[in-house]
Swiss-Prot record:
<keyword id="KW-0843">Virulence</keyword>
<dbReference type="GO" id="GO:0034220">
    <property type="term" value="P:monoatomic ion transmembrane transport"/>
</dbReference>
<dbReference type="GO" id="GO:0039520">
    <property type="term" value="P:symbiont-mediated activation of host autophagy"/>
</dbReference>
<keyword id="KW-1182">Viral ion channel</keyword>
<comment type="subunit">
    <text>Homotetramer. Interacts with the immature particle in the viroplasm. Interacts with host CAV1, early and late in infection. Interacts with host integrin ITGA1/ITGB1 heterodimer. Interacts with host integrin ITGA2/ITGB1 heterodimer. Interaction with microtubules blocks trafficking to the Golgi apparatus.</text>
</comment>
<feature type="transmembrane region" description="Helical; Signal-anchor for type III membrane protein">
    <location>
        <begin position="29"/>
        <end position="51"/>
    </location>
</feature>
<dbReference type="GO" id="GO:0016032">
    <property type="term" value="P:viral process"/>
</dbReference>
<keyword id="KW-0735">Signal-anchor</keyword>
<dbReference type="GO" id="GO:0044169">
    <property type="term" value="C:host cell rough endoplasmic reticulum membrane"/>
</dbReference>
<keyword id="KW-0407">Ion channel</keyword>
<feature type="topological domain" description="Lumenal">
    <location>
        <begin position="1"/>
        <end position="28"/>
    </location>
</feature>
<dbReference type="GO" id="GO:0046872">
    <property type="term" value="F:metal ion binding"/>
</dbReference>
<dbReference type="GO" id="GO:0005576">
    <property type="term" value="C:extracellular region"/>
</dbReference>
<dbReference type="GO" id="GO:0015267">
    <property type="term" value="F:channel activity"/>
</dbReference>
<comment type="similarity">
    <text>Belongs to the rotavirus NSP4 family.</text>
</comment>
<keyword id="KW-0812">Transmembrane</keyword>
<keyword id="KW-0106">Calcium</keyword>
């Protein structure tokens, strides 16, 4: 029944608009008829599209204020586009979403910088340790006797019988 009533209401509005337009057309001095007709068509379409949408949205949603605000912003943005403007109206919710996104990105970049600086500090510490191990330390006295095996060296006077056992002697071979 609601659909029939709505259809009857729509037909009566169209009939009213037609009779109004015919009354305007009878005046020969009316030069702005196409503009007025297009504006009336847009207004009628917005009226017919927005009222049922708003009723459904208000019945189904719990947060009616946000729905109404969103619908109104959408209608104004549509009108601005029809008028030729490139700017759009934004709500505080959209601005807050963008700000939250920017803040999340900044936090992510700060965490990345913190990780990178921590790694760089660790690398510098590692390089310092490697450098400390590679540097030559000056020592005053080094006991090289172990290296060249000179602790058990005897002089010629210390050999038994005064003879050097490593000195070659004459060898005779039988033929």
């Amino acid at each position: 029944m609601d659909k029939l009533t709505d259809l009857n209401y729509t037909l009566s509005v169209i009939t009213l608009m037609n009779s109004t337009l015919h009354a305007i057309l009878e005046d020969p001095g009316m030069a702005y008829f196409p503009y007025i007709a297009s504006v009336l068509t847009v207004l009628f379409t917005l009226h017919k599209a927005s009222i049922p949408t708003m009723k459904i949205a208000l019945k189904t949603s719990r947060c009616s204020y946000k729905v109404i605000k969103y619908c109104i912003v959408t209608i104004f943005n549509t009108l601005l586009k029809l008028a030729g403007y490139k700017e759009q109206i934004t709500t505080k919710d959209e601005i807050e979403k963008q700000m939250d996104r920017v803040i999340r990105e900044m936090r992510r970049q700060l965490e990345m910088i913190d990780k990178l600086t921590t790694r760089e500090i660790e690398q510098v510490e590692l390089l310092r340790r490697i450098y400390d191990r590679l540097t030559v330390r000056k020592t005053d006295e080094i006991d090289m006797s172990k290296e060249i095996n000179q602790k058990n060296i005897r002089t010629l006077d210390e050999w038994e019988n005064g003879k050097n056992p490593y000195e070659p002697s004459e060898v005779t071979a039988s033929l």
